[in-house]
Structures are given as structure tokens and as C-alpha cells.
Design a protein with these regions (language model features):
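Domain-scale detector for complete catalytic domains at protein termini or as standalone homologs
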Residues: 1, 95, 155-156
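Surface-exposed, Lys/Arg-rich phosphate-binding patches that contact polyanionic backbones
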Residues: 2-29, 49-62, 76-78
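Short, basic amphipathic alpha-helical segments that act as recognition/interaction helices
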Residues: 25-49
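Short runs of predominantly hydrophobic/aromatic residues within well-ordered alpha helices
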Residues: 27-30, 35, 66-70, 92-96, ...
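Long, intrinsically disordered, low-complexity Ser/Thr/Pro-rich regulatory/activation regions
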Residues: 56-91
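Amphipathic protein-protein interaction modules
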Residues: 78-132
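Glycine-rich, aromatic-bearing surface loops/beta-hairpins
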Residues: 114-156
Length: 156
């Protein structure tokens, strides 16, 4: 399963995504910002409300070098969520082989892509619940987004 956009992302980010330099370049930027929240919380939506069609099956150019980093964040979040001790090398190796596929364009297995989609869905729910509302400027969005990180609101 390639990346699939949580349904709420498209409408939430529609006013701050586009070709203008004052906007997010792609919807993947919004997807990634949502996924970071879910990953940091170590929480996902198992019944994620995702768009039916594929969003992407690769990383956009700006993220091309970040695939290993994103895979690492996913592995760390899943290890924490599954309570795998950091000194349990066998369990961590098994988890990595379940989530990573080196030949995949995303460097993630189908299971890994599905989990990242679920973390992103959790992230958009948190944004909608805890930020001050839908933003019409990227600057206002980032101010609110980073304030939520700095104050720990996203991690509650």
C-alpha cells in the first residue's frame, strides 16, 4: 500500500498548499507534518479514514534523502508502542524486517507504509483537536504548529 492521504488532510491544508513560495509545496508536506505528530505520540488510528486512491508511492524530491530517517522514526515509534526493550536485539531486528523493504521506493514494506498512513491519520486528528483552527496562511499555521510542539500540546 503506497502512501494514502488521510481524508481530513486535503481540506485542512488546501489553503496553505500550492506553487507560491509562501505555501507548502505539496500535500506530502502536510502528510509528513501529521505523521510526525502521530509518531512522536506513539499513537496511530487503526481504523484510519484514508482517501481511497493512492496518494504517492515514492518520496517527493524534497524528501528523497529522508527515507531512511522516516523509516527510523517509524521503527522507533513501533518499538515504543509495542513495548520492545531497546536491548532486545532479536525483537528489534524482527520489527525492522517487518517494516523496511530496501527495494521499495519508500524504503518501507507494505506494512510499514500502512502504519505510517495510520500515524498520519492520528496526526491530523490531533491538529484538528489541539491547534487553534484552520489556517489560511502558512506563517500562522507554522506559528501555531511549533507552539504546540514547544508547549507539549501535541504530546499530551
Amino acid at each position: 500500500m503506497p502512501f494514502r492521504l488521510p481524508k481530513k488532510c486535503r481540506s485542512y491544508f488546501s489553503d496553505i498548499t500550492g506553487r507560491d513560495e509562501t505555501l507548502l509545496d505539496t500535500l506530502f508536506d502536510g502528510y509528513y507534518l501529521c505523521a510526525l505528530i502521530g509518531l512522536a505520540q506513539g499513537k496511530l488510528n487503526t481504523n484510519a479514514d484514508l482517501e481511497a486512491s493512492e496518494f504517492l508511492d515514492y518520496y517527493p524530491a524534497d524528501y528523497a534523502e529522508s527515507g531512511d530517517y522516516i523509516a527510523g522514526l517509524l521503527i522507533a515509534a513501533e518499538a515504543k508502542r509495542k513495548a520492545i526493550p531497546v536491548d532486545d536485539a532479536n525483537a528489534l531486528e524482527k520489527l525492522m524486517t517487518q517494516l523496511v523493504e530496501s527495494q521499495s521506493r519508500t524504503r518501507l514494506s507494505v506494512e510499514g507504509e500502512n502504519l505510517l498512513n495510520q500515524y498520519a491519520d492520528r496526526g491530523i486528528d490531533v491538529i484538528l483537536e489541539r491547534m487553534t483552527g484552520r489556517h489560511t496562511s502558512l506563517e500562522a499555521f507554522f506559528q501555531d504548529y511549533f507552539e504546540c510542539w514547544n508547549s507539549g500540546i501535541f504530546l499530551e
